[in-house]
Structure formats: structure tokens, C-alpha cells
Design a protein with these regions (language model features):
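Short linear sequence motif anchored by a di-proline
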Residues: 1-260
Length: 260
């Protein structure tokens, strides 16, 4: 997905606070915009604490409280709407630790024959619009370091007609009128919560093919969301990214299946 909106602007949109001083100061590196957020990366979320709504940066990939290691969260980047209320990994978070993942857009991959997949960028139609993805969060204590780790996942559902042309799943996108109930940890009406986990209406997303450079998490930058002619697309070298290395194998981060 892409997250370029600064935490302070996210706080304004969602009537929340940025309490972490590093997130308020771009010079500290606490928040860096990304056009290629990958699993285990920091992820901007909005969640409800006991004393108010906050903007935080957990890692993407929910680590259940009972997990023995952080590795168990590396692939738990998505929770399926159909099973989230009963899944051992997600049911506790669904009951009382729901969050919103504000995104400026996301990627889906279309199977084009054989093993090739064509990436598409899906972004909101209109300027200054942030997508409110339904998410879950959790806290886990690392048994080795003793440190508490906050992590999060995105909930997915069957795709609407527009998105289905590319992929059969998509993130749940919450309309503004559902934000308060979704974030409220005291809201325990399972039927109400499950009723929110439906596909967004057609006509709200701009969808276009983008370069296969997005398949490599070492690549980052606004050019990744630019429309391309798939027939003319050629993979280029990685652009600057803090975790990029001049040599070495590309890690398996699940790119190509992010929102299953």
C-alpha cells in the first residue's frame, strides 16, 4: 500500500492525537512517506486508547499475544472478513482492538497467464482523500528482549465489481459514519461489526496498471504509482530506500498477494 499523509494530517482527518514526538517531527525519521509499504514495515494506524484516539506506527503483520516469536506475524498481514471473528489469530483483536489504516492507495496483482502478474494501483478518486481501511491491532511481549511490540493487520473482503477485474479480494474501506463505532473498544455487537465488513461501492477508486518495479520492496517513490503500458514495462534498478542494499537477494514479502 502507499502511505504519504503525515501523521499530523491523519490526526486532523480522524480527530485523533499524535502523542509520539518523533512522529510529529519529520526531521527525526519517525515517519517517512512510502509508496511501497511492505509486510513488517511500520504502518500508520488510528486506534482508540482508554484516554483518546491516537495515531501510531505499529509493524504490519499482527502478532497474536500468545505467539512464541515475531515471525508468526510476518505473514498475518491480512484478516479475512469471513473468518476474522473466529480465527484464533484475530478474534481477540476483532472483539476489542480494532483500528483504521489510512492509506493513500494500494496495489493489487492481476494474473495475466503463467506465473506473470501485472500490478495495478488503486487510489481514491479526488484530491486529498484518504482511504480508511478496516484494521486490527495487538500487543505482544517479546520473550527474549522483554519489549512490548504493537502490530496490526488489514481486513479484506470479496472485491467489488471494479476491483474484481484485477483481483477477487480487496481491503474493507470504512465510510466516515462507521469510524466511531469501529474504533470503539466497548462496541461488542458482533452483528453490527460484521455488517461493516463488506466491499466498498463501485466508482470510488481510480485503477490503472503500474510498473512491475513495485514487486521489489527495495523500490520506493511516487513513480511507482504512475500509469504504465504493461507491454512496454521494464524492471529498473531499485530507487533509494532505507532498507535497500546494493547487493543481496530480494526478501520474500508477499508482494503480489498482499490483500488476499
Amino acid at each position: 500500500m502507499t502511505q504519504q499523509t503525515p501523521p499530523e494530517e491523519v490526526a486532523r482527518i480522524f480527530d485523533a492525537e499524535v502523542r509520539d514526538a518523533e512522529l510529529r517531527d519529520p526531521d527525526t525519521g519517525g515517519f517517512q512517506p512510502s509508496w511501497n509499504v511492505a509486510p513488517t514495515d511500520p504502518l500508520t494506524v488510528v486506534l482508540q486508547r482508554e484516554d483518546g484516539r491516537t495515531v501510531e506506527r505499529p509493524r504490519w503483520g499482527l502478532i497474536p499475544s500468545w505467539a512464541k516469536s515475531a515471525r508468526e506475524g510476518a505473514r498475518a498481514i491480512n484478516a479475512r472478513a469471513e473468518t476474522v471473528a473466529s480465527s484464533p489469530a484475530f478474534r481477540v483483536a476483532f472483539a476489542k482492538r480494532r483500528c483504521i489504516v489510512p492509506a493513500d492507495g494500494f496495489y493489487e496483482w492481476q494474473q495475466t497467464g503463467g506465473t506473470r502478474k501485472q500490478p495495478f494501483f488503486l487510489g481514491p478518486i479526488g484530491e486529498h482523500v484518504v482511504l480508511a481501511m478496516a484494521g486490527l491491532w495487538s500487543v505482544w511481549k517479546d520473550p527474549v528482549t522483554g519489549l512490548w511490540v504493537t502490530s496490526a493487520a488489514v481486513i479484506t473482503t470479496d472485491a467489488n465489481s471494479d476491483v474484481r477485474v484485477v483481483h477477487d479480494r480487496m481491503p474493507v474501506l470504512l465510510p466516515r459514519e462507521w469510524w466511531a463505532a469501529w474504533l470503539d473498544p466497548d462496541e461488542r455487537d458482533q452483528d453490527l461489526l460484521r455488517s461493516m465488513l463488506t466491499a466498498a461501492p463501485d466508482g470510488i477508486l481510480d485503477i490503472h496498471p503500474v510498473s512491475t518495479r513495485v514487486n521489489d520492496v527495495r523500490n520506493d517513490g511516487p513513480d511507482l504509482t504512475a500509469p504504465v503500458d504493461p507491454a512496454a514495462d521494464r524492471v529498473a534498478a531499485p530507487t533509494s530506500r532505507s532498507r535497500a542494499k546494493a547487493t543481496g537477494a530480494t526478501p520474500d514479502t508477499g508482494q503480489g498477494t498482499l490483500f488476499d
